[in-house]
Amino acid sequence: MLLTIPTAVTPPWTTMLGFSLLPAIVMIAGAALAVWRAPGPKLRSAILHFAAGVIFSVVAVELLPDIVEHHAPYEVALGFGLGVATMLGLRYFTQRLEKKEESGEAGNAPAPSAGAGALPPTSSLPWGLLVAIGIDILIDGLLLGIGFAAGAKEGTLLAIALTIELLSLGLATAIELRQDGHGKGRAVAIVAGTSLMLLVGAGIGTTVLRGATGNLLEIVLSFGLAALLFLVTEKLLTEAHEETETPLLTLAFFVGFLLFLMLGMVA
C-alpha cells in the first residue's frame, strides 16, 4: 500500500507573493548595480559560492529530512529521477539555442568601423541568452512554489536563498548585455522583464501544488531536491570556479551553509 503524507501547512497567497517579489526586486537591483559599477570577478565568485552554500543548506536541513522521514523510496526515486532528467534536458536545450544564436551572429558580424573612437553598435536582443535565463528563473519560481508546498518555513528560507542567487544572475546578465552594446537603461529593463518569470513560476507552483498531499507531495519534493542540487553543483559552483579559487572564496560557501543551518535551527 502506498504511503500517505500529512498535508503541509502553506502560508496565505499574499505571503507567498511577497516572498516571490523579493528575489525579483533584488535581481533588478543587481542589474542596476552592475550598469552603475560592475563588481569584480572575485566578488561575483564570492556571491556565487555563498549562494551555493545557502541553497545547499536549505536542501540538507529543511527538504531532505522531510523526504527521508516518510520512507517512500519509490516516490522519491520517481521524483528525483524526473528532476534530474528535466534539468539535463533544459540544459541541453538552452545550450543548443545559445550555440545556434552565436553561430548566426558570427555569420552576420558587420565589418569593423574605420573610426578609431567608434562605439560598438547596439546589438539585437540576445534571444538565446534571454530564453535560457527565462527558463532558469521560471524553474526557480517553480522551486519556490515547491518550497512553500513543503511548509512556510521551508518556503521562506528558500526564498531568501534564491534571492542571493538571483542577485548574482542579475549582475551577470546586465554585464553581458552591456558588453553586447545595450544601453544602461535597456539592460536593466531587459533584466526586469526576465525577472517576471519568477512570479510566473511561483504562481504556477503554488497554484498546482497548494494542498498537495501524500505521494504527490513526496514526488514533488524529491523533484525539487534534485533540481536544487543540480542548481548548486552544475550552475552556481561551476560558474564560481571560473575564477581562480582562493581560501576566502571557498570559505564563502561554508559561511552560507552555516548561516542558514543556524537560521533554520532558531527560526
PLM segments and residue spans:
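Intrinsically disordered, metal-sensing/regulatory segments
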Residues: 1-267
